[in-house]
């Protein structure tokens, strides 16, 4: 039996798990955004 590929892309799932509003919803998520702003990331979230 062949092993299935584990990455099954979906823009909706991506946004729900890693999107800006998902990050803003928790204190730790806001810390992630703060870190990425401090680092100077062009894109803060998915």
Curated annotation (Swiss-Prot):
The record's annotation in InterPro entries points to: Ribosomal_bL34 (IPR000271), Ribosomal_bL34_CS (IPR020939)
Task: Note the SS bond partners.
Answer: none
- Family annotation (Gene3D superfamilies): 1.10.287.3980
Please note every region of biased composition (Polar residues).
Answer: 1-11
Alphabetized, the UniProt keywords read:
Ribonucleoprotein, Ribosomal protein
Q: Which GO terms describe its molecular function?
A: structural constituent of ribosome
Q: Name one GO biological process term.
A: translation
List where Basic residues composition bias occurs: 32-46
Q: Which GO terms describe its cellular component?
A: ribonucleoprotein complex; ribosome
Xref: PROSITE patterns: RIBOSOMAL_L34
Q: Where is this region: Disordered?
A: 1-46
Q: Which family does it belong to?
A: Belongs to the bacterial ribosomal protein bL34 family.
**By what name is this protein known?**
Large ribosomal subunit protein bL34
The gene that this protein is the product of is rpmH
């Amino acid at each position: 039996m062949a092993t299935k590929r584990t990455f099954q892309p979906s823009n909706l799932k991506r946004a729900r798990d890693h999107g800006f509003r998902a990050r803003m919803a928790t204190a730790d998520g806001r810390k992630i955004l703060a870190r990425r702003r401090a680092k100077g990331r062009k894109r803060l979230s998915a």
